[in-house]
Amino acid sequence: MVTTPLHSSPKSSLKSSTTSLRSVHTQSGRMGPSEPKHRTTKSWSIWGGNDEEEPELSNKNKGKETAQDNSQENDNVSNEGTRLHDNQQTTILKETTRIEKGEKDKKDRNAAIVEKNTRPRAWPFFWGRNKKDPEPTHNIPTDADNNTLSRLANSLNPAPLTNTYIPYKPDAILIRDKGVKTAKKLTDDIGNQFPNIVVPSFDILPKQTIWNTVTSTIWKWKTEYWDRRPSSRVREGEEQVQHSQNQLKEETNTVANEAKDEERLEHNRGSLFRVDPWKKINLLSDYQSRPIRVLIVGVHGFFPTKIIRPFIGEPTGTSTKFVTEAEEIVKEYFDQHKVPIEISKIALEREGEIFDRVDFFYEVMKHWSKEINNSDFIYFVSHSQGCPVTIMLLAKLIKNGIINLDNSQFFNDEIQFCSSKKIISVLAMAGINNGPFYGADQTLFVRAYQTIEKDSLRELFEFQKFDSKQSQSFIEGLRTIISNNVKITFVGSINDQLVPLYSSTCLFANHPNIFRAIFIDRGSQTPAFITRIVKIAGSLLNLGYNDHGIIKEISGSLAGTLTGGGHSTIYNEKQVYHLGIKFALETTDLSEMYPIEYSPYKLSELGANPYRLPWCMRGLMYESNKHFSNEEIKMLFKEFEEWEPETKQLKDIKNRLNGLKYRL
């Protein structure tokens, strides 16, 4: 009986299995009954395979195999051949899997090496570089200029997140990519941003005309003449008039003079005029001969400890957040006018007490004095406690000569010549300029929190005292920066749970270089009547007139809930950042700077007398009829009649103003 050769099935299996191994050649010998335990030996590597080939039996030897008559031996040989066939297939599959995995790993490593050498890296700004990432390599051109090398150095060594100067780069890292920006825009179209309002609008300021220019000049001459006149008491002493009739006339003149002084003071306080932005854009860009260099500085506010954050919310208002939002609005503003700009950023971050923060930020800014002085437009954006910090910091920088406002008078090899002065704008959002709500330090919640963070929280209430060290430094800072033509935009939140409107809008200081606005979130559900009141009052204040203290009286009743978010939603509104830019670039400058006017008041008396609010409303309506159209008062009456307050505080306001029903 002739035994069937066992090499046919293993050979066909080897042929089909080894086709996937391009770099490996496997040869299998014939398995005879005399060598049942023989196996092929292989050695593998990730670069290929080396076979130790067994000598193949010649066909001549194959033909010499003889048949055996024993059927039991045939069965044993067949079973042994089947087992060898299965073992070979299993071995080949394992070897194939290992080879394919090795080749894949090799390709991945090669691709990573190529990518490392060729692909430029752009590190994310918010988190920095991952420690697991390989160091980037770049081909630095030998003929590159200084600007190219500087930008390349910035890409190789990205600047830290905070307390450093982030220079301009064409692919600005703070701007969101197109995908994220588009998603944000869609969210705005259906979300809470567009319905939000900021009152009063910038358009409340009068537009500059020939008539109001001449009128302002006449009033200026009249004021100068009035100031040169000797006082009535001096004239009386010179004339030595002593009888009672002259004394009575003197008293009458005193009352008349006080009324005239108030009228003259209101006109002197006045307001700036709206002008075309191209007037200042041309000056900043040397008549469009170069890009405008813009520097944005962000200063965050008070950060509570983690224990208290579940009650008042997480502190999302970081300096980086403000700088990012402001940069986007600045780009949009200048893109509308098709003006090239170069934006640099400094995000100042440090927690602690106010004076410690001012000193620390001063050292940071002093280190970048050259870059700061090469800027044409400097935009400070601040929030909460960061507002007084920003004003004190800017005043210190100007006093000590770190910021030079006029590069046409002082310039050198490092500081470039500029034909115009710098324009500096300060945006103060929900600033604690006059402290938190009066009496909040006596609440159980705040008293319990003072045990955790005593000094940082206690000094916020020091701003409620006009004779405190913090308030005096703040007032001195205001005087310094306004005398150097810095323009300040105070914006308060209607339902702020921490800062009242009279504090966030800084009502104790008056000057044409100050613009006040109130942010009204759609989620606050502010009644139309309250919105109308703050709009009229804000318009009067921005035009240099008197609101008769109505904002001070109603501020206490507008406090939001502790978790309402009014204090932390203001810095998400684009209109707020846009307002700070427009007030700086689209208004006139005073021909002659005069000091800021301070009007201190007692916070303990605000809202204490229920009869004061109707009197304030009477004065507000009088001023509105005098300076605005009658439509505002008509709408005020209509909205008051339709108003149905829900909270106890708002019901109290309506009860005290019931005289409006009878047009009293």
Curated annotation (Swiss-Prot):
Residues 57-67, 95-110, 231-241, 248-262 have a biased composition (Basic and acidic residues). Residues 68-94 have a biased composition (Polar residues). This is Uncharacterized protein YML020W. InterPro entries: AB_hydrolase_fold (IPR029058). Residues 1-146, 231-262 are annotated as: Disordered. The lineage of its organism: Eukaryota, Fungi, Dikarya, Ascomycota, Saccharomycotina. Present with 377 molecules/cell in log phase SD medium. Residues 1-23 have a biased composition (Low complexity). SUPFAM superfamilies: alpha/beta-Hydrolases. It comes from the Eukaryota.
